[in-house]
């Protein structure tokens, strides 16, 4: 029998009108019950879900009454990706583990990528799951030992 954790309670979305060069950003209070129960810290990656839509965002936290309890403010990139209205309910939680990072770690240690590993990396990049650090690791891994013909077929 596998135990399923209950999803975190929903928060009300507030449009922040923050333009962050296409970077999805979420702003939450440091005393937010979701931050505490989920163990979310500043500069964490979070997954924001609104119905069938989701976006991975960078979390910043504030010690201010700028946001009410139970609210999360979103940048324009996050707002557009979710296609929501002011006050709509969203769920904020940890993003899923990136299995494709195992391929990058193997590549850093001199092993070649399989077609499946490269496809998983590309899929995660296209879906916006890679942070700048993840992208830098991929570029470093492929620059130190360039991709060979078999890896790019």
Locations of regions flagged by a protein language model:
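Acidic, glycine/proline-rich low-complexity segments that act as flexible tails and inter-domain linkers
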Residues: 96-153
């Amino acid at each position: 029998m596998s135990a399923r954790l209950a999803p975190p309670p929903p928060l009300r979305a507030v449009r922040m009108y923050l333009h962050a060069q296409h970077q999805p950003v979420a702003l939450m209070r440091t005393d937010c019950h979701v931050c505490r129960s989920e163990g979310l810290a500043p500069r964490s990656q979070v997954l924001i879900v609104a119905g069938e839509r989701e976006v991975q965002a960078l979390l910043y936290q504030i010690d201010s009454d700028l946001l009410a309890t139970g609210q999360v403010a979103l940048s324009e990139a996050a707002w557009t990706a979710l296609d929501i209205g002011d006050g709509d309910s969203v769920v904020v939680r940890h993003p899923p583990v990136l299995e494709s990072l195992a391929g990058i770690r193997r590549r850093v240690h001199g092993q070649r990528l399989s077609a499946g590993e490269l496809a998983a990396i590309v899929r995660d990049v296209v879906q916006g799951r890679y942070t700048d650090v993840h992208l830098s690791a991929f570029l470093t891994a492929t620059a130190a030992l360039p991709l060979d013909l078999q890896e790019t077929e």
